[in-house]
Amino acid sequence: MKRLLVWIGALTVATSVFAAEKPALDVRDFGAKGDGVTKDTVAIQKALDTCVANGGGSVLVSDGIFLTGSLVIGANTTLEIAAKTSLVGSADIADYPVINVRWEGEFREGHRALLTASNAANVTITGAGAIYGAPPVLSKLRNPRGPVLIELIGCTNAVLENFTTQYQQLWSLHIFFCKNFTARGLTIRTVGANGDGIDVDSCDGVTIEHCDINTGDDAISLKSGRGLAAQNLARPTENVIIRDCRLHSSIYAALGLGTEMSGGIRKVKLENCVISGKQNAIFIKSRDGRGGYMEDISGVNLTVLKSPTFIGIDLLSKGIQASDPVPGDTEKWPRVQNISFKNVRVQDVTALVAGKNIPAARPIDDFSLTDISGTCVHGIALANMTNVKLSGIHVTGYEAPLISTENVKGTGLELSTKQ
């Protein structure tokens, strides 16, 4: 029996080594031209399908500009976009089939992404090349939704690394119902409203590291659906680590949490990042009818540059209401607790915290700021919070008072005008 197990183990290792050593499938061998004029959709898709049929491996796109419509990546497949190589989205909407997607927190029809994978394990997109989305005439579509750049749905152990993307007025990466996802070394550029960088939507186990994201809308947005159906589905976005990144939004926030958060957002860590936003560096946002929760959100070792607000909190927003809002005088509001930021350096920030748009019916519990230094014009404005902890707030250039509160309980509030 032991010999049999040893033989099986050796065979498994040998098979794995063989799979790893399979030569990459070159899309040119399947008819791709890479001339920037010919549509290479069929050829590239054939290479991807052949890779899956072979039990997995790599597909190589290199040395050219490859015009393509929507492509589907299967399990155990690595798509490599080599240096000095571009994938460019077609301008023909017929090249993006309509499927069921989650958009603005609810399920509806939408055009399939330029690159997509669905319910697939071990999908990787890598390489030093670039991915350019469809022109604005397509990305601005809303009914049905236009094609996002990359969309992973229900995938496990997916990795996106080292490439560059450019898009406008629609999301670059939408990661939905995924588990164990990594984005590493990406350079993401977008312009315009809805031009998010990475949207993490009801996912568990997300690492975003060493990325440079400069966007129109939120650089990174954490979501989990909106309304009673999303709350009952109970698929939170959780166990998220964002580290060693540069995040900038030219319209909204470097990191947005909500407003679509009815399934919950929890266990989020932002570490060793340089962040800035046109409105907020970090924006915690929701409204009545969302329900759900946000908890265990932390940031440490951050540099905040030239932002009107370091942390903005608006739980009374007028964002799009769900078709099935969560009912109840208290339950309709999100439960927000255990929010902490430590060792933060701010530079040319107008306000440290704008946190007064919070419902009295559901105060935020356990909000802490520790060791905040730098320059700001206005300080910390809080309302409807319990267990607030402020310590080591060493900023200069502000207009008094440093701390303004209304219906707030906690420690370190001595400089506030109200208790």
Predicted stretch roles:
Residues 18-419:
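Extracellular/periplasmic carbohydrate-active domains that bind, remodel
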Residues 1-4:
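Positively charged n-region of N-terminal signal peptides that target proteins for export
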Residues 6-16:
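Bacterial N-terminal signal peptides
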